[in-house]
């Protein structure tokens, strides 16, 4: 049986009169790719902030080892592109020995050697996302949290991104927790899907998302159309 790395038990969070999440319970299993989906304002960011320890629950319990090392890739990375700095120099600032052990493990797979002399500002969206992922694994995390990583990426870059995620998980033995709104790619690439809209609407494994299933109907009620996206093992 797989070990759980995060467990939410009846967790609620209030900010004044607002309650972005209410009585939320779920488990993230070790070495799985778990994806949290939901509409804007569903409470996804609140969940991430609770996992990171930036917020405390108003009620309920979060079971997570605070010694757990987390690599976090925010929706907006916040790196200015005005400064003319190359990929190599940027990574050197974060890992002085350049291409530390983890980055070396994946550098050939993500073509870092090919782009390392390019300026950050000249990278495509897909190339920049690879650099961001390299940053997130420098400290050898147990858990990687990715907030809307597919945003602004074209279909080809999305496919390359997921190939990289699967490679990193296997090579470095990392658990992945992802926020996304793209149900089709989620179904194809996740071990577990959790649907949130202030509370847990449904959760399960991708092959359970079949036409007219309870899972599928719950997703459809939130605007996630599943009838074209049957997933078969």
From Swiss-Prot:
It comes from Rickettsia typhi (strain ATCC VR-144 / Wilmington). The keyword ATP-binding applies. It catalyses: Zn(2+)(out) + ATP(in) + H2O(in) = Zn(2+)(in) + ADP(in) + phosphate(in) + H(+)(in). The gene is znuC. This is Zinc import ATP-binding protein ZnuC. Belongs to the ABC transporter superfamily. Zinc importer (TC 3.A.1.15.5) family. The lineage of its organism: Bacteria, Pseudomonadati, Pseudomonadota, Alphaproteobacteria, Rickettsiales. It is found in: Cell inner membrane. Its EC number is 7.2.2.20. GO terms for molecular function: ABC-type zinc transporter activity; ATP binding; ATP hydrolysis activity. SMART domains: AAA.
